[in-house]
Amino acid sequence: MFGWAITFLVIAIAAGIFGFAGLAGTAAWIAKVLFVVGLAAVLIMLVMGRRPPTV
């Protein structure tokens, strides 16, 4: 998930350099969304992993 976020961030930076403002904004928004989703997934996995085993 974080790999995709970094990919879209690089696309946003490259598009911004070449003057494609609309594409840069969209790619940056996608990168932010993927980062937040990935961060939420990591936090959920941490919380789920800390539960004691049920017998």
Swiss-Prot record:
Residue intervals passing through the bilayer: 1-21, 28-48
Compartments in which it is found: Cell membrane
UniProt keyword list: Cell membrane, Membrane, Transmembrane, Transmembrane helix
Primary localisation category: membrane
Presence of the UniProt keyword Transcription in the record: no
Membrane topology: Multi-pass membrane protein
Domain of life the protein comes from: Bacteria
Pfam families listed in its UniProt record: DUF1328
Record flagged with keyword Transmembrane helix: yes
GO CC, alphabetical: plasma membrane
Family matches, as InterPro entries: DUF1328
Family: Belongs to the UPF0391 family.
Protein's name in the database: UPF0391 membrane protein Tbd_2772
